[in-house]
Amino acid sequence: MTAFPAAPDLAPPSRAAQGERVLCAMSGGVDSSVTASLLKEQGYQVIGAMMRFWPDDKRTDTFDSCCSPDAAYEARRVAEQVGVPFYLLDYREPFQRHIVGPFLEEYARGRTPNPCVNCNTKVKFDELVKKAKMLGCRYVATGHYVKRVDNAQGEVEFHRGDDPRKDQTYFLWGTPRDALPYILFPVGELEKPQVREIAAERGLLTAQKPESQNICFVPGKVQDFVAEHLPQAQGYIREIATGEVVGEHLGTQFYTLGQKKGLGLYQSHRVRHVVHLDPDSNTVWVGDYDDCLWTGLKATDANYLLDLAELPTELEVQVRYRTAPVKAHVLHADAEGFELEFAEPQFAVAPGQSAVLYAGSRLLGGGLIADHARELPALT
């Protein structure tokens, strides 16, 4: 991980010296376009950059709009509109190594990955920060809907963006703590309609560009992408209460906890949910809604954006994007991981997803949800 110099005298962005150099991550979307424009207007020396992820042997339509060659063309045109230099940076190898490979490996293990978290942690705020230092930049800026707060102690905190529908702090829990002072989020205090209005006022060509909805390297359904890269393996679907075989499947990688549609059971007059995936025995276990309720979780690969000793024992945790955080009690926390007890049982807490910690609007850190240990009927 990149080592950052100490910066006790770092001024908040609102008081930053004129002409500070900033590397602005551009995606060809409206958020990063406005980010570059606002920074330029605030007196920063802006360098626009887009990270190339798509390989040469892929069709241009195999990557979503935020990562495609067309997006690179639009990002370059916006940089010209704003009046800043633009670089297309080759990150194909790190992207395959850190993002696509682990994404498929997690599905093969019966887990549900979130590649956007890995991308921010291991590519954008690691590889891109290294490039920023090489270019003599003091800051990296992105179009994330996240608020940077410089507190009274001179420390930088990340808080939820002012637009609750667009808040993206969930994806940034893995940001190295020593990188926080060097990251700017110019649109974090804006709502999406305001961002589009700013883009329109400045004549930016991305002002009305539709938002990206998919995982950038998955052009369609995740199941289709997984099927293309992981071999099928026929196995049984079993009832968690009895061990009875109630159906067949073509691989545990095609299922996720809580799933109730597309199970293909032999016959069932009750709604069944996926409650456990066991790739070792190639078994998909199903049961009632209550079988998917969890009273707590354990997380690994933890990262904290404050001193561990300052982590409150009562906090909030968010276990998937676009769901409300829930109150939780910290049973244990160390540098490697943590264990939480929910105030109320939670449905389908999926291993591989992120457990993200908050105190009010402040992002405290997070970890990867660990596999659940549970007793299973003997296989016959």
Curated annotation (Swiss-Prot):
The keyword Membrane does not apply. The keyword DNA repair does not apply. The record marks 144, 353 as: Interaction with tRNA. GO terms for biological process: tRNA wobble position uridine thiolation. Disulfide bonds join 119-216. It catalyses: S-sulfanyl-L-cysteinyl-[protein] + uridine(34) in tRNA + AH2 + ATP = 2-thiouridine(34) in tRNA + L-cysteinyl-[protein] + A + AMP + diphosphate + H(+). Keywords: ATP-binding, Cytoplasm, Disulfide bond, Nucleotide-binding, RNA-binding, Transferase, tRNA processing, tRNA-binding. Its EC number is 2.8.1.13. InterPro entries: MnmA-like (IPR004506), MnmA-like_C (IPR046885), MnmA-like_central (IPR046884), MnmA-like_central_sf (IPR023382), Rossmann-like_a/b/a_fold (IPR014729). ATP binds at residues 25-32, 51, 143. It is found in: Cytoplasm. Residues 166-168, 320-321 are annotated as: Interaction with tRNA. One of its GO terms (molecular function) is tRNA binding. It holds the Pfam family tRNA_Me_trans. The active site is at residues 119, 216. GO terms for cellular component: cytoplasm. Gene3D superfamilies: Adenine nucleotide alpha hydrolases-like domains (2.30.30.280), HUPs (3.40.50.620), Translation factors (2.40.30.10). Belongs to the MnmA/TRMU family. Catalyzes the 2-thiolation of uridine at the wobble position (U34) of tRNA, leading to the formation of s(2)U34. This is tRNA-specific 2-thiouridylase MnmA. It comes from Deinococcus radiodurans (strain ATCC 13939 / DSM 20539 / JCM 16871 / CCUG 27074 / LMG 4051 / NBRC 15346 / NCIMB 9279 / VKM B-1422 / R1).
